A protein has these predicted regions:
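Extracellular beta-strand-rich recognition modules
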Residues: 345-349, 412-418
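Extracellular beta-rich ligand/substrate-recognition surface
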Residues: 185, 316-331, 391-393, 524-528
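Sequence context surrounding c-type heme c attachment/ligation sites in exported
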Residues: 149, 157-251, 693, 697, ...
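Extracellular carbohydrate-recognition regions
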Residues: 142, 257-303, 434-471, 483-487
Length: 826
């Protein structure tokens, strides 16, 4: 990209910024006369309501409306914009835009709609990152490789960046695939499609079966990213909530290593190891190639172990052990991926209240599919009383054998999970063609045990240091569990001929997209999965694709129409930008370090944004003033909560369970329904279940969470009017609004005062004289109807009058909810 020259325009006095000059230049270029009709400014009410919904997803308050009406200056509007950008509501509003791109949902769909573990933490991450105005390059890099970047503390976590990597795994998935390898290929294709559309604005997934027919994307480019995804595995990791935990774990491990050096035990153990064959360290470098989460396995390669009472004992070399530092710690460890070459896989393990599983082709739903993956998950239960209080190193070893006959030739890895206060130790992994492996059974376990007696006294300061670090680590707040990504290998994926996962062609080097490498100013070094290299390529300021895509998305969300009208497809089949110069002008701001909030602020303060909706009609090759826009589903629901005075503005936390009507039936239906009003939380905090989507939100075009959606449909259909007329939610919120207006101090207000407050809440303006008169007449009719209906009742007169008042205002509230002005922006 090169910086475009800011155009000189005849109507320069109309412009407030260079953005306005680019906009006006497109109009003047179409004019055959020396003048062009300049867009008129929006009135104060329309502008405030527009900016409030665009920036916060909520209507402005009556106080904000009146303050701006009294002083509609540029400075006052800029101050309102700054307050909106600084509010928590900004992240909730713009976070929902990003969740559309991420195909965010909390279940997997298919037949039983199983949960995606802790998916809500990804939503929390997005909202927090946008509120903190994390630079776009860092934000995107965290999505691709947050676990491989320098830590970024936030949300009460020592490192929030890994939470973003759940993005890779938020798509729908099959829980009982006939072909596991094909299922993995399909899941990867979905992830690649999201990478392409959300970050490049290109349909890379079209190159899965053949070279792209229209864009310069060969099939090897698709498999370059597919290789990255296949070397990336989905795990439920542990993330520290205490920034000291990692340092304390390192201190404790160093203390154990120093103790072993002081005792001179390392040579003895290495000599012992030489007599033992097919140990885990033969295949995986003493467990150092294993990936770990949490701190339970941090000291698993130490030669000494720390007992609960503070004593030190010799530990076996070459095992993976979660109890060497402290049996109270939680964590998990995963082996590198390896090909299955024989029928049986043997693991020698011991422990209690923990479990072990074997993952085939990154298929993590083994616990959901007993037919296909029966026996791939094993639990180590609590032992009998004779072992319960003893040293973990006295626990008996056991052989766990997995039958892999159906999966020979596939890739697998072993996962150890210690998350319930127990512990687990793995001594060996071995393959054989026999169900019982003689090599495993004949290991000299007794010889090992006798050789590990600790007889040399240890210096007290060394022991105290180890115990002190262990105890300090115990005192840290526990980590959270979260869905994250990690590297599982470093191999290139072959091109799948015609998209077949069983018919391979040439290898496609990971992360080296031709369109990126051609524009990049530096070479990208591949390492591990290639995710970090991919992140570096995409966020390179010299490559225009990400920056143009993001700039276009910002313009789309603020103007209802992008500079390029197809935000997810900048290719040959997409619409050309009406101003490539303006697009590059905005994209370069992001590439050179501008944050999302900074760009949004600059655009919102332009004269173009402040123009009246639909004030001119020009060809598609020029800027179009804002159209009259319908609010999206979330804003309609949130606006009703605000109007009724019941919005719970608290932020964060687990999702509110979806409300299930009697018509929402099917397999996978949750056992309990959520509240009708979603606990009065903002819509972004409502649970998104793929098989049980909220009917009200669907009526107003909330997208299906199947793939990237950069531009929602904006339909105007009878079903929407029917939803507003008949929805249980709308009736409930109208009743709450009516009750609020007919109780407490508001009951003492005049009808006109209450009518005025309703108009401000619904439409951000005072009612006109004719509207106020009609509203009074409506209330009189409703009260009369209520009086007639209760004429024979014997209720207390005061109570009955209050009920009549509440019913009348409820009916008026419902009428305002159904008004076009309530659900549309000008």
């Amino acid at each position: 990209m090169t910086q475009p020259t800011v155009p000189t325009v005849r109507g320069d006095a109309w412009c407030r910024s260079d953005i306005d000059r680019f906009v006006l230049a497109t109009q003047e270029a179409l004019s055959i006369t020396s003048t062009v009709a300049l867009p008129i400014d929006a009135d104060a009410t329309s502008l405030m309501r527009r900016a409030s919904f665009d920036l916060r997803g909520l209507p402005p308050s009556e106080a904000e409306i009146k303050a701006f009406a009294a002083d509609p200056s540029d400075a006052n509007f800029a101050a309102f914009v700054d307050r909106s950008l600084a509010s928590e509501a900004f992240g909730e509003r713009w976070g929902r835009h990003w969740l559309d791109l991420a195909r965010y949902a909390e279940t997997l769909a298919h037949e039983f709609d199983y949960d995606i573990p802790s998916a809500w933490r990804y939503r929390e991450y997005v909202i927090d990152a946008l509120n903190r105005d994390v630079p776009p390059a860092r934000f995107v890099a965290e999505h691709l490789a947050g676990d491989l970047l320098e830590p970024r503390a936030s949300m009460g976590l020592a490192n929030a960046a890994p939470l973003a990597t759940a993005w890779w795994f938020l798509g729908p998935a099959t829980h009982a695939p006939v072909d596991v390898r094909q299922d993995e290929a399909d899941r990867i294709a979905g992830a690649v499609d999201v990478v392409g559309r959300s970050l490049f604005g290109l349909s890379i997934a079209c190159a899965r079966c053949h070279d792209h027919k229209f864009d310069p994307i060969p099939a090897r480019d698709f498999y370059a990213i597919a290789g990255v995804a296949r070397n990336t595995r989905r795990v439920e990791g542990f993330i520290d909530t205490d920034a000291r935990a990692a340092t304390l774990a390192n201190d404790a491990r160093a203390a154990l290593n120093n103790a072993s050096i002081a005792l001179g035990v390392a040579p003895q153990l290495h000599a012992l190891d030489a007599s033992i064959v097919t140990r885990i360290d033969d295949a995986t470098d003493g467990g150092r190639a294993w990936s770990r989460a949490g701190h339970a396995f941090d000291a698993s390669t130490a030669l000494l172990a720390l007992n609960d009472d503070g004593s030190l004992v010799l530990a076996e070399s070459g095992t993976i052990d979660s109890a060497r530092l402290d049996a109270q710690l939680v964590g998990s460890a995963r082996s590198p991926a390896f090909p299955l070459t024989k029928r049986f896989l043997h693991l020698r393990v011991r422990g209690r209240e923990s479990w072990i599983r074997t993952i085939i082709d990154n298929y993590w739903l083994d616990d959901r599919n007993g037919l296909l993956f029966e026996g791939m998950r094993r639990e180590l239960p609590a032992p009998d009383a004779s072992y319960a209080a003893s040293d973990p190193r006295a626990y008996p070893w056991r052989i766990e054998t997995f039958d892999m006959q159906r999966f020979i030739g596939e890739r697998a890895y072993v996962e150890l999970i210690d998350d319930r206060g127990g512990w687990i130790e793995l001594d060996a992994i071995m393959e054989s063609d026999e169900s019982t492996a003689s090599a495993v059974e004949t290991w000299d376990v007794d010889g090992i045990a006798s050789a590990l007696e600790l007889t040399t006294p240890l210096s007290e300061p060394i022991r105290v240091r180890a115990v002190g670090a262990r105890d300090a680590l115990r005192a840290c707040s526990p980590p959270i569990r979260a869905l994250v990504a990690e590297d599982s290998g470093a191999f290139d994926e072959p091109v799948h001929m015609r998209g077949s996962s069983r018919n391979y062609g040439e290898l496609a080097p990971r992360a080296q997209l031709s369109i990126l490498s051609a524009a990049s100013t530096h070479a990208v070094a591949l390492d591990g999965s290639g995710r970090l290299a991919l992140a570096q390529s995409i966020t390179d300021p010299a490559t225009p694709y990400l920056w143009r895509t993001l700039a276009n998305r910002v313009w789309l969300k603020l103007f209802g129409r992008g500079i390029a009208e197809t935000p997810d497809d900048f290719g040959q089949l997409g619409a050309a930008p009406w101003s490539t110069e303006l697009l590059d002008h905005l994209a370069l701001k992001l590439a050179r370090g501008a944050t999302l909030k900074q760009l949004i602020r600059e655009v919102v303060l332009t004269r173009a944004y402040r123009s009246a909706a639909g004030s001119t009609e020009l060809p598609s090759s020029a800027w179009q003033p804002l159209p009259v826009r319908r609010l999206d589903a979330e804003s309609i629901r949130d606006a009703m909560l605000v109007a009724s005075g019941t919005l719970d503005a608290s932020t964060g936390g687990r999702s509110v369970p979806v409300h299930l009507s009697e018509h929402m039936q099917g397999r996978g239906r949750p056992g309990a329904s959520g509240p009708v009003d979603g606990a009065s939380r903002r819509s972004v905090y409502l649970e998104v279940r793929r098989n049980f989507l909220d009917p009200f939100m669907q009526a107003f075009d909330q997208p299906l969470p199947s793939t990237t959606c950069g531009r929602r449909h904006a339909s105007n259909v009878p079903a929407q009017s029917l939803a507003l007329l008949n929805s249980e939610l709308v009736h409930l919120l109208a009743a709450r609004w009516g009750e609020q207006l007919s109780s407490g101090a508001q009951r003492e207000m005049s009808d006109d005062a209450r009518i005025d407050s309703m108009w401000y809440a619904a439409f951000a303006r005072a009612p006109r004289t004719d509207e106020r008169r009609e509203a009074r007449e409506f209330l009189t009719l409703e009260r009369g109807a209520r009086t007639d209906a209760t004429a024979d009742a014997t209720a207390d007169a005061t109570t009955d009058a209050s009920a009549q008042d509440s019913a009348a205002f409820t009916a008026l509230a419902h009428a305002l909810f159904c008004a076009k002005e309530f659900v549309f922006l000008r």
